[in-house]
Amino acid sequence: SATRRAWSDGSGQDQSRHAINGMLTSLDPHSSFLDARNFRDMQVQTRGEFGGLGIEVTQEDGQIKVVAPIDDTPASKAGILANDLITHIDNEPVQGLTLQQAVEKMRGPVGSGIVIRVNRTGQNPQDIRITRDRIVIRAVRSRIEGEDIGYLRVTQFNEQTTENLRRAIEEIRAKAPGDQLKGYILDLRNNPGGLLDQSISVSDAFLERGEIVSTRGRNAEETQRWNARAGDLTQGKPVIVLINGGSASASEIVAGALQDHRRATVLGTRSFGKGSVQTIIPLGSQGALRLTTARYYTPSGRSIQARGIDPDIVLEQPVPEELRARVSENRGEAGLRGHLNSGQQQEERSASSVYVPREQKDDVQINTALELLRGTKTDPKFPPQPRRAEATPASPATPAAPAAPTTRQ
């Protein structure tokens, strides 16, 4: 038949893929069809190594939006910022491309060049030339601040994150004896998330017991819960978690778990609000389906979806006058078309600023955390007050079924 001939020569196959992807993206912004190449790319990225520019992107109004550049990659070195809109890749418009197609165009052989056109609020579009490189993501960066504070920066949650974190904590403890170490800063700012199991094991590194996160699907029986195992790697030392509007998904699970258990004080500004679970369904050689199947809930039963995590200590990062036009408003998950609702009768909120200064002397969030840990500044929210009774955190209320989508991305 004509249909069979079309499929065998590839045209029908492409049409079917486009149709499937169109149906999936109409469900919510995070559901999509991954062809074989993009499925392989996704697997490579979760392993923490791939070739490309080093940016986490999403799609908004047909344009590619930067969620966050990854530290020490060609994109971050070229000055790409969170919330930049990529309109052209090598002089070809991205309008009409799927997110996966645009990502595919941005990847390529190590050493090859690419020009991307970027729109920023208050500025004329600019072309930025970048040389592709082998992206090996250091999931955790660490250092000792002034011989008494352990600083842990988690850039994303890939398969190496928890092991990287364990090693970093061991190195800090070896360099700073227990009586000298005053506490830890866990920096999750502009961390776009990643693997659920890694967010659970990272949370577990700071907890002795209790629920870390639960996921709940459309039906109540589709609930799953994950609990901490004994063994706090930081030995109960005070912890301050830093978040901002670029902290999403797995980052929000960690911040929410440590906040609910009063294990850490969360400082910064409201997080992104991506509180949904994506399940990957492999389709053999054809690729895979990525489907949103559940929402995340913190131990106390809070839905993260389209709401985000509110810090215990709200502290805005001052943006220099000359950069204000470049740092546009961040609407977060609630600003994405067709996003899943929170599943609770609560108002949706936009996220907050994603700006983080390059120089630590200008970083009021890190510097305030250091002052709190050293006792040179005080705040009633630090250290967090323990719960009055060691009770099991409340279970999340049964969420309403997701609303039927009325718009598509």
Residue ranges and their predicted role:
Residues 3-12, 65-69, 73-82, 87-284:
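Cleft-lining beta-strand/loop regions that shape enzyme active-site pockets
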